[in-house]
Amino acid sequence: MYTFDSRVRYSETDENGNLSLESLIDYMQDCTNFQSEDLGVGLEYHRQKNIMWVLNFWQIVIDEYPAMGENITVGTQAFGFEKMFGHRNFLITHQGEPEHRIAIANSLWVLMDLKKGRPMIVTPEIGDVYGIHEPLPMDYASRKIKVPKDGGKECDQFLVQE
């Protein structure tokens, strides 16, 4: 698993002085980017190849929100590539205490060909550099959301895009 250590900054906290959800997700995304950069397949590589990974699905389980100033370790690992998809886990723990979990996540990414504007197959050149690891132990949810049989409940409408 690729990891980096950090300290929760004031600018990353919510009104209670704890790491915000947005910042927790930012740590996960940064971890992936740091790994890609360290492996030589970072932003410049992606620009040259006209490719981009796009997040398709997140499943994040948060056990706690660390407080400002706490030291944390953020980790990520790929656990599979199939067709256009990349499966990736994330783990955030208290620094030096790998058994003290803060959050764990499952994610699914789609590799996009930016010239064609559509998904592309993950080639060995792209996938092999990350290696394949065992999925982290967690309850994996389906990425498909079931519609309730009773049709759910009607809520206020809101404009998504004009």
Task: Name every feature range the model reports, one short phrase each.
Residues 59-96:
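Hydrophobic beta-sheet segments that form the core/acyl-binding groove
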Residues 96-103:
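Acidic, low-complexity central loop/insert segments
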Residues 1-55, 106, 111-162:
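Hot-dog-fold acyl-thioester-processing enzymes
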